C-alpha cells in the first residue's frame, strides 16, 4: 500500500450547471486523479456542492408546487443527495479510468454530516446563493419559520 497520501479538493464550479456538464467534467478530472494513483498516491477526494444543493432544493420546491401533498426535502437532505450524486459520478468516472489503465483499486464514496452552531452570526448575513428566488411575501414566510434569507439586488 502506498505511503504517499494526498487530499484533492474539487471546487463546485468545476462540475458545471447540468448533469451532462458534470459527467464531462468528472471524466476530465478522473484522468488527473488516475495520474496520481498511477504515481502511487493514496487519494482522499473532497468536493464542494453548493450549486448542486441549490438545484436539488429548487427541484424539490417546484415539485411541491405541482403536488401539494408532497413534503419537500429539507436543505440538509438536499445536501446529502448532492453528495451522493456528485460522489457517485466521481467514483464511477475514476473507477472507469483506472480500469482503462489496468489498475484495479477500490473507489468509494462516503457521505458526511457537519455540525454547525445554529446561532453562528454568519447565518444572519448569508453570502452564498442556495435555493430559489422568492417574492417578498415568500421571504417573510421563510423568516417566520426561522430561516435566513437575503435580498439579492436587481
Predicted regions and their residues:
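Ligand-binding beta-strand-loop-alpha-helix segment within the catalytic cores
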Residues: 63-154
Amino acid at each position: 500500500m502506498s505511503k504517499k497520501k494526498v487530499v484533492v479538493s474539487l471546487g463546485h464550479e468545476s462540475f458545471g450547471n447540468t448533469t451532462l456538464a458534470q459527467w464531462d467534467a468528472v471524466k476530465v478530472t478522473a484522468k488527473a486523479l488516475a495520474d496520481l494513483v498511477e504515481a502511487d498516491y493514496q487519494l482522499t477526494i473532497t468536493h464542494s456542492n453548493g450549486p448542486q444543493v441549490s438545484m436539488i432544493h429548487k427541484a424539490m420546491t417546484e415539485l411541491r408546487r405541482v403536488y401539494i401533498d408532497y413534503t419537500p426535502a429539507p436543505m440538509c437532505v438536499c445536501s446529502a443527495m448532492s453528495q451522493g450524486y456528485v460522489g457517485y459520478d466521481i467514483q464511477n468516472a475514476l473507477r472507469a479510468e483506472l480500469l482503462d489503465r489496468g489498475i484495479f483499486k477500490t473507489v468509494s464514496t462516503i457521505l458526511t454530516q457537519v455540525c454547525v452552531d445554529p446561532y453562528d452570526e454568519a447565518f444572519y448575513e448569508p453570502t452564498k446563493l442556495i435555493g430559489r428566488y422568492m417574492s417578498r411575501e415568500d421571504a417573510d414566510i421563510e423568516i417566520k419559520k426561522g430561516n435566513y434569507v437575503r435580498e439579492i439586488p436587481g
